[in-house]
């Protein structure tokens, strides 16, 4: 089960990576003003742009950087219930893991069709017992349209602001914060940093974008490290009452999966830094705020993890379902 979960997460990261790099029919999709429906992702872009329009008109005071900050917090908060459902599903998976391992051990080495069907049936009964459904596995997918839509909105916003009379671009009266213009773009692709600086010299804008890129990398790495620490602690708690010599060891496949996951996560952090360097500065601000808020969100969720886990245990015991 853990391998399946890791595979799902890996697929999510791969899909997200290809989407963020703008893999679409038209490479110009991310450099168009937000006007008219011309691609599938516009379904998600316009609601996000609408949020930014409202924020820019009200608490953003026509300030584009402030609007990015407030809008990011609002969108992440909207997705918070989905995060909570995902976290609860992870807790249930912790409860089910010992019984799941018993089923796997029971049918270990049995490749006949009858054994496979029985194992599948017992697994489904176990999931039903703990209230685990397919919907819980789909929760991360539900978040993705929100975040991808907002990413594409931020990417296209500079072109909307530059377009005269654009419905959302005209809302913003200023696009700078701390001397950094959030709509300017490096337009240097993935060229080496030294060559860019040598050619154009150090400017406040380039220093600011570089700082944002570094902050994106740092905040993303902190989020990854803290997540790994939480996962390790949860795994240790799960087998804390089992003597060390009886604790299950990771298989070679599980170790390879874990290494692949770590590589994907760190590679994602690196790519985010590169995207910020070659994109408008607003993207960097969006990711920094999003990373910090997500880390806080995860920490806040961790605070109540043990209480929710204990509550789930008691609930199952009261129903007489835990032997």
Annotated model-derived regions:
Residues 2-15, 19-323:
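Helix-loop-helix
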């Amino acid at each position: 089960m853990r391998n399946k979960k890791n595979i799902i997460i890996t697929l999510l990261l791969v899909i997200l990576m290809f989407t963020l790099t703008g893999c679409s029919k038209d490479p110009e999709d991310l450099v168009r003003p937000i006007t008219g429906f011309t691609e599938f992702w516009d379904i998600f872009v316009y609601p996000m742009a609408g949020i930014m329009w409202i924020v820019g008109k009200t608490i953003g005071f026509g300030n584009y950087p402030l609007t990015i900050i407030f809008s990011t917090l609002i969108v992440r908060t909207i997705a918070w219930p989905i995060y909570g459902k995902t976290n609860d599903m992870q807790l249930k998976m912790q409860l089910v893991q010992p019984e799941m391992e018993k089923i796997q051990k029971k049918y270990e080495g049995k490749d006949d069709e009858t054994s496979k069907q029985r194992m599948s049936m017992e697994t489904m009964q176990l999931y039903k017992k703990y209230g685990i459904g397919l919907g819980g596995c789909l929760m991360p997918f539900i978040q993705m349209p929100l975040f991808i839509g907002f990413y594409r909105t931020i990417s296209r916003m500079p072109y909307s602001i530059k377009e005269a009379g654009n419905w959302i671009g005209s809302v913003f009266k200023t696009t700078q914060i701390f001397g950094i213009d959030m709509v300017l773009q490096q337009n240097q692709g993935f060229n080496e940093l030294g060559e860019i600086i040598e050619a154009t010299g150090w400017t406040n804008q380039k220093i600011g974008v570089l700082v944002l890129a570094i902050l994106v990398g740092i905040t993303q790495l902190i989020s990854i490290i803290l997540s790994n620490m939480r996962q390790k602690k949860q795994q240790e708690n799960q087998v804390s009452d089992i003597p060390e010599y009886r604790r299950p060891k990771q298989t070679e496949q599980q170790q390879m999966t874990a290494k692949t996951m770590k590589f994907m996560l760190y590679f994602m952090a690196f790519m985010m830094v590169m995207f910020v360097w070659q994109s408008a500065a607003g993207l960097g601000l969006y990711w920094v705020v999003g990373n910090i808020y997500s880390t806080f969100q995860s920490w806040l969720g961790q605070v109540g993890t043990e209480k929710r886990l204990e509550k789930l245990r008691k609930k199952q015991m009261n129903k007489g379902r835990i032997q």
